Amino acid sequence: MRRSFGMVFAIVLVTGCQGSEVVSAPEGLMRIGTGNAGGVYAVYGEGMAEAVRENFARVTTEVVASDGSVENITMVTLGKVEVGFALADVAADAVAGRPPFTEPQPIVALANLYENYVQLVVRDHGPVKSLQDLSGRRISVGSRASGTAVVAERILNVAGLGNDVIRRNLDIKMSARALAESEIDAFFWSGGLPSDAITQLMHGTDVRLIDLKEVAQPLIRAHGELYTETTVPASVYGLSSAVTTVSVPNYLVVGRDMPLTKAYWLTRLLFDEQQKLAQTHPEGHHLDQWTAIRTYPLELHEGAARWYRSVHR
């Protein structure tokens, strides 16, 4: 029989640098910054919130929709949410104080969750057959405060298209609708696989993904090895073949000042409730105790680090 953390694990002994310490079950508010409806952040965040509600009677949860990574980090640092999803490239800019951030942001990580895949979506019989065909075209580069917008601009610049496209800042659902209605010629999306909005788009519109092999290595050389050249498997969306793209890890980020109790239990909850999270979205299967600690350049929150040490002994 399944048991609740709130009832069974009221306290736990954790071995730290100063010996055994008592970590009590959390209480208070847990607001989760997610992302666009139709994306994985929104689905994963709802699953996390449900897991918290089921296990911690004294924690009140709220799922906060957002533009994505940039807005989530901003909300964490302003105390508008306690935890948020963020792409590793955006998180790296945040702690370094690089644009779009004006100064270093005091964030740390609980886990590396899964990989986001850059997806450049076009109509199957439309005018865009390759990345270079975007020249002069109307494209959505994602919501303004999103990780999609960051990587889309980097790809366009690496491809020499930075000044040659007509940009629109649309979220994933609006992008899909605009493409279906021929209001745009293409849209960028950085998300897990599959992304619901793209799956739904494919049910009523003939679309495909553009191969990004030509910019994969130049992007990595220009912006670092947080990016990886990879493929979107054909099976994910029923494509005719796999499509080369770039991926970047997703981190679960919190403020440095998050209480140790909350950080410890939320990290533990991710793993103890992994099966349920994976039922919420397949990306939940990719959580792993060893890859989860790879959150460069973010430090792990001490509460998260203590939980990982307890299972890695």
Residue ranges and their predicted role:
Residues 13-16:
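C-terminal motif of bacterial Sec signal peptides marking the signal peptidase cleavage site
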